[in-house]
Amino acid sequence: MLCATVSGPSFCEAKQQILKSLHLVDIIELRLDLINELDDQELHTLITTAQNPILTFRQHKEMSTALWIQKLYSLAKLEPKWMDIDVSLPKTALQTIRKSHPKIKLILSYHTDKNEDLDAIYNEMLATPAEIYKIVLSPENSSEALNYIKKARLLPKPSTVLCMGTHGLPSRVLSPLISNAMNYAAGISAPQVAPGQPKLEELLSYNYSKLSEKSHIYGLIGDPVDRSISHLSHNFLLSKLSLNATYIKFPVTIGEVVTFFSAIRDLPFSGLSVTMPLKTAIFDHVDALDASAQLCESINTLVFRNQKILGYNTDGEGVAKLLKQKNISVNNKHIAIVGAGGAAKAIAATLAMQGANLHIFNRTLSSAAALATCCKGKAYPLGSLENFKTIDIIINCLPPEVTFPWRFPPIVMDINTKPHPSPYLERAQKHGSLIIHGYEMFIEQALLQFALWFPDFLTPESCDSFRNYVKNFMAKV
């Protein structure tokens, strides 16, 4: 069941949160410990409006256990259908509630801000009878979150395993895959009641209504991933295609690569987008490389097929496709590539095959030289770009925070989606350059990824819808 958490804090706010959320969820949770003191009539109104909600009252730090118990006793006398009670409540008090009010369904909850042993917690909780056992954990990285999800799928039902904090979102989105008895999101206009708890509208945007125990997982890995809009755009397309799948951003550092790939092997991943700094760091975890990835020695797309992980790169072809759409030929053109990372490698390799004369500018000259050798180009220190004479097209592949000498040839492209518009492109446009935004490349390389992931479902109409969604979204940024 999907549950909207309502926490006011005022009576009027709580009532509005219920009314706005009720039609989107299966049940409402009233966090009465967070709602301002209610009189009997107000409490009755909220319970009636919420239609058999879960009543929850957590113990405040300054509240004595005796007062907490009395509060729970008074709520139990209302004979709610559900009560959520923390496992720290003295057993005698819990037994009193169960004996006096046998019709109340109990959710026994355990919350921790640490990384703990899920199986041990669950087995200990089984000693206390309950209708649902809810365990909320705090993973320290994406791998730990995925390992919790794997273990949660094996627990006897009904149970609920969720994660808090920066890395907790996958457990919320994948709750149907886990077969959680209950999943929680902050109700419409309601504050979040736990670190990392998603808002209801955010959770639903992950194609949540289509998800089940048989869902496929797609996502983005890298560090950072917060600049990407892919969780919005890609889930829009998945929803439009009515696929039983979702797309989630997973922050993964280079040091976490080994544990991450160990975790995903036993989960229904079907595809991953790869961003920096992992494009060249994951080769040992791929079973086979497509020519597109071999050519540039960089991976931006993983396809999971027949128990194998296949590596591709759509960055270069995405740029080539975009330039062709704009009737821009690169044959015999002098193109400055700024940067020598994974995306720069893919773009340079593809444009070299189309006859471009490539000039690689980078902070580390050895990296520029290595790339120049691969694409039969020339390498230069980043600072020398300022006085370089012959440029027809410049493509910036450096992160937004890295400064470099701005040049304004006839065509200027910045592959960064954010910030939008980039200060560099704004200045280039004022100088009369034709500018190409990062989101335009993002669109084309993403569509090539989709063609690898689910070719049987992609249509020209859905591709156009995706393009329009991204363009309209970026216009509002």
UniProtKB/Swiss-Prot annotation:
NADP(+) binds at residues 339-343, 362-364, 438. InterPro entries: Aldolase_TIM, Aminoacid_DH-like_N_sf, DHquinase_I, NAD(P)-bd_dom_sf, Shikimate_DH, Shikimate_DH-bd_N, Shikimate_DH_fam, Shikm_DH/Glu-tRNA_Rdtase. PANTHER family: BIFUNCTIONAL 3-DEHYDROQUINATE DEHYDRATASE_SHIKIMATE DEHYDROGENASE, CHLOROPLASTIC, SHIKIMATE DEHYDROGENASE. The active site is at 111 (proton donor/acceptor), 134 (schiff-base intermediate with substrate), 279 (proton acceptor). In the N-terminal section; belongs to the type-I 3-dehydroquinase family. In the C-terminal section; belongs to the shikimate dehydrogenase family. GO terms for biological process: amino acid biosynthetic process; aromatic amino acid family biosynthetic process; chorismate biosynthetic process; shikimate metabolic process. GO terms for molecular function: 3-dehydroquinate dehydratase activity; NADP binding; shikimate 3-dehydrogenase (NADP+) activity. The keyword Iron does not apply. 3-dehydroquinate binds at residues 21, 29-31, 56-58, 172, 197. It catalyses: 3-dehydroquinate = 3-dehydroshikimate + H2O; shikimate + NADP(+) = 3-dehydroshikimate + NADPH + H(+). Its EC number is 4.2.1.10, 1.1.1.25. Residues 1-209 are annotated as: 3-dehydroquinate dehydratase. Residues 210-477 are annotated as: Shikimate 5-dehydrogenase. The keyword Amino-acid biosynthesis applies. It comes from Chlamydia pneumoniae (Chlamydophila pneumoniae). Bifunctional enzyme that catalyzes two sequential steps of the aromatic amino acids biosynthetic pathway. In the first reaction, the AroD domain catalyzes the cis-dehydration of 3-dehydroquinate (DHQ) and introduces the first double bond of the aromatic ring to yield 3-dehydroshikimate; in the second reaction, the AroE domain catalyzes the reversible NADPH linked reduction of 3-dehydroshikimate (DHSA) to yield shikimate (SA). Keywords: Amino-acid biosynthesis, Aromatic amino acid biosynthesis, Lyase, Multifunctional enzyme, NADP, Oxidoreductase, Schiff base. Shikimate binds at residues 228-230, 300, 315, 445. Pathway: Metabolic intermediate biosynthesis; chorismate biosynthesis; chorismate from D-erythrose 4-phosphate and phosphoenolpyruvate: step 3/7; Metabolic intermediate biosynthesis; chorismate biosynthesis; chorismate from D-erythrose 4-phosphate and phosphoenolpyruvate: step 4/7. This is Shikimate biosynthesis protein AroDE. NCBIfam families: aroE, PRK09310.1.
